[in-house]
C-alpha cells in the first residue's frame, strides 16, 4: 500500500512542492514498478527491487556540493553505469553547496535522475546542508523536507540519525554537526547520556 504527502516551499523565486510516498508491505527480493503524476504530467514507468537478503553492491558517493551540477551529474551517472548491479547508493553528505537554496536541491535531484528513481539511497547531511541563504549555520530544513528517512532514531531529532538493514549489513547514519546540534537542541547530549 502507499500513502503520500506534499510540502510547499519557496526558494525565493518560485514555489516548489516536495512530494513523498511511503510504500508498505513490500515483499523481499521483488521487482516493483511505479510512476509519478503532477497535475496532467505523468512520468514513464520506473522500477526498483527490494532487498533479497543476499550479497549486494552499493555505489558510495562523496561530497557532491557544487555551483554547477553538470560535472557531478556526469560523475554520478558514470559511477552508476559502471555498477548497474548496485542495489543502493549512499551519499556521504554535502549533497548541495547551500542547504537552504531550493534551486541547488532541484539541481542535485536532476543530477541523480536515472539513479535515485531506480535504486534506493541512503543520504546523510554534511555541514553544507546546515547553511542558510546568508551562509550562516541554520537547521537543515530543506534537507529534512526532501528526504523521508527511517524514523527509528530519537523522535526529537527525526532524520538527523537513522539506521537500516540491507542484506546482512546494518547501516547507521549519524549527523556529526555536533556544535550546531548542541546549539539547536541544548539538552541533546544530557538526554542521550542517560539513554
Describe these PLM feature segments:
Residues 1-60, 77, 81-82:
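Acidic, histidine-bearing metal-coordination/catalytic regions of metal-dependent phosphoesterases
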Residues 2-16, 59-74, 99, 180-194:
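Acidic/histidine-rich helix-loop elements
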Residues 14-16, 31, 57-60, 90-93, ...:
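A generic short-segment signal for beta-strand/edge and adjacent turn/coil regions
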Residues 22, 31-38, 42-47, 104-195:
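Extended active-site neighborhood of metal-dependent phosphoesterases/phosphodiesterases
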Residues 25-27, 52, 60-66, 168, ...:
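Short, flexible loop/turn elements at secondary-structure junctions
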Residues 55-130:
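Conserved, compact domain cores that house catalytic/ligand-binding motifs in diverse enzymes
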